[in-house]
Each structure stands twice: as C-alpha cells, then as structure tokens.
Amino acid sequence: MYLTSEKKEEIFSKHGKGKNDTGSAEGQIALFTHRIAHLSEHLKTNRKDYNTERSLVMLVGKRRSLLDYLMKKDIIRYRAIVKELGLRK
C-alpha cells in the first residue's frame, strides 16, 4: 500500500493538531492532497484506468468541499493551508 499508517501520522502531525488528529479539516485536506498527487502519478502511466480517474475526481470534490467549509468557518486557517500545500484558490 502506498500510504502506510506512519505516513498518515506524519501528514496529520505536520498539518493537524497532532499525529492522532484525523478529524481536523487541515489534516483531511492534506491527506486528500497526498492521495490526489499519488493518483495523478498513476494516471500518467495508466491513461485508460477510468475507475481511478473517477476516484480522483471524487477526491478533488471532497477536498474542495472541505476547503469551502474551512473558508466559511475560518479564513485565516484556510489561507494558511492553501499556502502550505501550494493549492490554487
């Protein structure tokens, strides 16, 4: 598996409030961003993998929903996570 529990803990500790903070919006956005990057690399070599392409679109939608929630709830945290992850607004 490409995403081990150690890697998840690293992502959550870097972007969340702690390594076990799996519920914060920032941690989930960072995890989705990592998964999106992995699926994008997979699709570069496997262009006809339509199931993965659909999964990628669904993940992008989930991340967008979380970003919208964070923007409405706390604009400072939203701007920080967008800058930290290098996402477009």
UniProtKB/Swiss-Prot annotation:
Cited InterPro entries: Ribosomal_uS15, Ribosomal_uS15_bac-type, uS15_NS1_RNA-bd_sf
Alphabetized GO MF terms: rRNA binding; structural constituent of ribosome
GO biological processes: translation
Basic and acidic residues composition bias: residue spans: 1-13
SMART domains: Ribosomal_S15 (SM01387)
Region (Disordered): 1-24
Keyword ATP-binding appears in the UniProt entry: no
Keywords: Ribonucleoprotein, Ribosomal protein, RNA-binding, rRNA-binding
Family matches, as SUPFAM superfamilies: S15/NS1 RNA-binding domain (SSF47060)
Gene Ontology cellular component list: cytosolic small ribosomal subunit
Transmembrane segments: none
Function of the protein: One of the primary rRNA binding proteins, it binds directly to 16S rRNA where it helps nucleate assembly of the platform of the 30S subunit by binding and bridging several RNA helices of the 16S rRNA.
Quaternary structure and partners: Part of the 30S ribosomal subunit. Forms a bridge to the 50S subunit in the 70S ribosome, contacting the 23S rRNA.
HAMAP family named among the record's database cross-references: Ribosomal_uS15_B
Family to which this protein belongs: Belongs to the universal ribosomal protein uS15 family.
Full protein name: Small ribosomal subunit protein uS15
Protein species of origin: Christiangramia forsetii (strain DSM 17595 / CGMCC 1.15422 / KT0803) (Gramella forsetii)
